[in-house]
Design a protein with these regions (language model features):
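Catalytic phosphate/metal-binding cores of nucleic-acid and nucleotide-processing enzymes, i.e., regions
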Residues: 1-110
């Protein structure tokens, strides 16, 4: 896949996740839509997560999660939303994060 078509595929996945978050009541937009934003999470949102969106044929969870954690905003755990083949709705995709970050989030719902 060429670089430009790969970027378009990634942009579509990010837009789909942003729409899903908005449907759930979070403010969300792609960081690509904000001029001059480089690095950091793929989405700008008031959701308490720092989200990295992936739509790739080959799954590279360790590298993706390392990237999400490295680029996470302070106080927001990094999480990867990875598109599941054949599933257009992001609610059916995979969400991957470190166990420690998940437990920290769950601690607040006890």
């Amino acid at each position: 896949m060429s670089g430009s078509s790969s970027r378009r595929k990634g942009a579509r996945a990010e837009q789909a996740v942003a729409r899903m978050l908005r449907a759930w009541g979070w403010a969300a937009r792609t960081s690509r839509s904000v001029q001059g934003v480089q690095g950091g999470a793929d989405l700008i949102t008031d959701c308490p997560l720092s989200i990295e969106v992936k739509d790739h044929q080959r799954v590279e969870l360790a590298a993706w999660l390392d990237q999400a954690v490295r680029q996470a905003e302070p106080g927001r755990p990094g999480v990867v939303f990875a598109k599941k083949r054949g599933k257009g709705n992001p609610e059916d995709w995979y969400a991957v994060m470190r166990v420690a970050d998940l437990l920290a989030l769950l601690k607040d719902v006890r």
